[in-house]
From Swiss-Prot:
SMART domains: CDC37_M (SM01070). The gene is CDC37L1. It is found in: Cytoplasm. SUPFAM superfamilies: Hsp90 co-chaperone CDC37. Residues 267-337 are annotated as: Interaction with Hsp70. This is Hsp90 co-chaperone Cdc37-like 1.
Amino acid sequence: MEQPWPPPGPWSLPRAEGEAEEESDFDVFPSSPRCPQLPGGGAQMYSHGIELACQKQKEFVKSSVACKWNLAEAQQKLGSLALHNSESLDQEHAKAQTAVSELRQREEEWRQKEEALVQREKMCLWSTDAISKDVFNKSFINQDKRKDTEDEDKSESFMQKYEQKIRHFGMLSRWDDSQRFLSDHPYLVCEETAKYLILWCFHLEAEKKGALMEQIAHQAVVMQFIMEMAKNCNVDPRGCFRLFFQKAKAEEEGYFEAFKNELEAFKSRVRLYSQSQSFQPMTVQNHVPHSGVGSIGLLESLPQNPDYLQYSISTALCSLNSVVHKEDDEPKMMDTV
């Protein structure tokens, strides 16, 4: 059955009895117990598997969503031309139609590539050595170790300091609440927040907390979109997150559809990966306490590679410069209350 929108989670609306029971014993702000080490290199295998899963997340997102957002912009431009008389109207209309046609072709090409990647993932799902295969470019591994260590320390320190606020943001369900919370805490608009939420999704699914995973996945994709929008527009993320919420609340055609599609795709990939053998050692051998899911203690067992972080949060909204330039009243500096 198709999931309702917004996705199920700890909403203010009445919840099913099963959902309430599932989340009733969940501490939103748990302590941070250390995750026990796996024997025989199991932790390293688990971490490497998480890295590959996040690499695939970037590949899927960049291939599908980028085309959809570009297509939405081209269609908006095409529609606006019909409302304005101009000597070159026919010429501009032809150019816009050509752009739409080209983007549709690119979208179809990416869709075929995405289907091929899904099939390959399913074929390798239960392979015991799947996580050690060279599925993607390994250039991210051969980075300067000193820089990696510094970035790891910075990322870990941020998540330790603001863990409760990140988790609070993850539990918000309304657009207005999320925007208001980020306005009050603009420092949370960063890659570390997106990374934390993504990892939290994997562990919630491993603990069979599907409804809560869907809620956190929604907020993880929100942060991914905001970060990529800022990156492509070359502005501070804290200065453009209102533009994202503006489009989300208005449910602008094309843009909102791309967000919903990516959210569903991300949740599907989380479920698929949690079934793979690369995820089993942590969930079966360690018996991770359910109160520690998503905590810093658990995250410390996962890879903190800066390129892994980049791969996790690099979703595609690839040509939003034109959109931002249209918003004359949108500040290109830190967003304030």
